[in-house]
Structure formats: C-alpha cells, structure tokens
C-alpha cells in the first residue's frame, strides 16, 4: 500500500546534504521493497519511504560535507549502504551523504539523469565488465523496451552487434526498432528460443536478461558455444535454480548475476562511468526514453503501470 502524506525532514547531519528533487526514478526494485521481496537482507519496519534514485539541486549542507556546494545539481543511485534498504527518494527533498552524489553537467537535465543513472550505469556494468560485443556478434536482450533494455539496445548497436530483443507488445517492438533493435520477438506470442534460432542458427554470443524468471532458463538454448548469460534484473521474479551441468551440455556457457553496487563502489569508477554515460547521452548515441512522468502524489498509479509493463522506457515522479 502506498500513501501520500507529510513528514518532517531534519537538517542534514554530518557529511550530508539536503537535495531538493527535480525528478525521481521509478524502478522495479522499488516495487520489490514495497512488497518486502527477495532483495531485502532483513525485514523492513513499515511504513518506509521507498525509492533509491533521484536528481535535483543541493539546498543545504551538513557539517563536513565535502566536494559539494549549495546550488550544485546532482543525482544519486542508492546512498552508500545496503542498496535496497536505505531508501527515501519518493519525497520532495531528502538528506543524503555527500559521498553518494554524482555531479550533473548542464548538458544533462534532471529528467534525463533520473531516467538514466541506475539504468545507464547498469547497462555500463553489463557492457564493460561482462559482455562487450564485438562487431558482428549477435546479442539477445530480454525486456528490450524497458529502461535498461533500450539503453543496451543502443549501446550494443553502437558497438556493431546484431541486436535481437524480446518485448511484450507490438507498440514496444516499434520503440525498440526505432532505437536500433534489428529483430524483435513478441515473447508472449511465440517461442522465443525457436525465433532466435531462426535468426541466428548457431545461437547468440550473449543473452542480457533483466526479466528473470520468465526468460532466463530458456535462454540457455539460445546461446552459442562459449556464450554468456547475464542476469541483471528480475522484473518477472527471481530465476529458478540452475543445474550447472546444463552449462557444459549446451556449450561451456558462462552465467553471471552481478550486483550493481559493486560497479560503482570505487570513486574513480563512479566518475569514469558516469562521465562516459553523460557523454553518450549528450552526443545522441544513447537516447533516454521516458515513458511517462507522474506527479509524486500519483506514485501508486506509476507502480501499477510499471508492474503492468504499460510503457516503454523509464517512468518518473515529479515533486
């Protein structure tokens, strides 16, 4: 249950800043926190303010807050602790550690930042640490019209890959194709394994999966010898346990399930990957698709639309 209401916000503590939100991201992890699902390391004491990602402007500094100033534009993705426990972005303003902030350049708007920081850095993690396709490689992207999926479609296409995407509707297929997806598969209507094999008989070099339970197990049969499966999200639920012998049987496959927080743990990495993301977005290599924006008071509607997979791209809340 989501309720709209007022709460008092204390002054920022030592090392913290108060950030006035301009745009707030709606992510599947927020739904999971709301439901008390598998991401949670320990039970939450409800009620809580959920949300992990937002962009805005710093309006007050706590003692000892370094590297920041009042009036600076910034974004954050988590606040440095357990990613799905230290929530609180679904608010007009919030106190966060200065150390968790990404400074925003003028070329990136609040809406762009909120729509792409978690999703874009997730795509960056997949590309740089696990699967950087070579020109001519075929890649299968599940949920190709999602926020992360659309960024992966564009990034893989930019690197010269043949991109195959699964989507839930023809409308989403059109969006994915418009941003570079070479082949789209309506996975609810056809067997996506057979459809992939018709396009690439030997299988794809990599499967990039943010859907999870509905797609991951069958993806083994889409992958070529020595291929890789990357599960980076679980929109349909956590994948079932995997028999490791299947990986040997179907071509010495590699499977990984990375943690986003590890990708941005190092300060140098945070700066490097965020700067790259800003440049790719500003140059038009990555176009950030915003499916819909909602007033913050209509958060429940935004969650219903996200769970119903109603829109392609990212959903935002506007304070």
Predicted segment positions?
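Mid-domain Rossmann-like dinucleotide-binding core that forms the NAD(H)/NADP(H) cofactor-binding site
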Residues: 113-190
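Glycine-rich beta-strand-centered segment in the early N-terminal region that forms part
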Residues: 8-26, 38-80, 88
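Short amphipathic alpha-helix with an adjacent loop that forms part of the alpha/beta core around
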Residues: 191-201
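N-terminal Rossmann-like NAD(P) cofactor-binding module of classical short-chain dehydrogenase/reductase
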Residues: 75, 140, 205-208, 230
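Glycine-rich phosphate-binding loop and adjacent beta-alpha segment
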Residues: 159, 167, 214-286, 319
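C-terminal capping/lid region of NAD(P)-dependent oxidoreductase domains
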Residues: 283-292, 300-319
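NAD(P)H dinucleotide-binding glycine-rich loop of Rossmann-like/cofactor-binding domains
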Residues: 67, 76-143
């Amino acid at each position: 249950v989501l309720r709209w209401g007022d709460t008092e916000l204390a002054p920022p503590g030592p090392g913290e800043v108060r950030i006035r939100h301009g745009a707030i991201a709606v992510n599947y992890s927020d739904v999971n926190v709301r439901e008390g699902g598998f991401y949670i390391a320990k039970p939450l004491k409800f009620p809580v303010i959920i949300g992990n990602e937002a962009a805005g402007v710093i309006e007050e500094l706590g003692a000892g807050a370094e590297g920041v100033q009042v009036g600076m534009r910034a974004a954050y993705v988590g606040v440095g602790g357990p990613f799905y426990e230290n929530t609180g972005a679904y608010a007009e303003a919030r106190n966060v550690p200065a150390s968790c902030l990404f400074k925003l350049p003028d070329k990136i708007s609040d809406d762009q930042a909120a729509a792409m920081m978690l999703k874009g850095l997730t795509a960056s993690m997949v590309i740089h640490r696990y699967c950087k396709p070579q020109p001519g490689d075929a890649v299968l992207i599940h949920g190709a019209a999602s926020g992360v999926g659309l960024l992966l479609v564009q990034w893989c296409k930019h690197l010269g890959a043949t991109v195959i995407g699964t989507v839930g509707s023809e409308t989403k297929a059109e969006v994915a194709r418009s941003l570079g997806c070479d082949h789209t598969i309506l996975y609810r209507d056809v067997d996506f394994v057979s459809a992939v094999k018709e396009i690439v008989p030997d299988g794809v070099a990599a499967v990039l999966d943010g859907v999870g339970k509905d797609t991951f197990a069958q993806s083994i049969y889409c992958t070529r010898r020595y291929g890789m499966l990357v599960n980076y999200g679980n929109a349909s639920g956590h994948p079932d346990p995997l028999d490791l012998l299947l990986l040997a049987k179907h071509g010495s496959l590699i499977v990984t399930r990375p943690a986003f927080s590890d990708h941005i743990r190092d300060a140098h990495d945070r700066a490097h990957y965020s700067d790259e993301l800003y440049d790719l977005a500003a140059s038009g290599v990555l176009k950030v698709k915003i499916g819909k924006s909602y007033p913050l008071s209509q958060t429940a509607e935004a969650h219903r639309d996200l769970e119903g997979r109603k829109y392609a791209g990212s959903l935002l809340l506007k304070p």
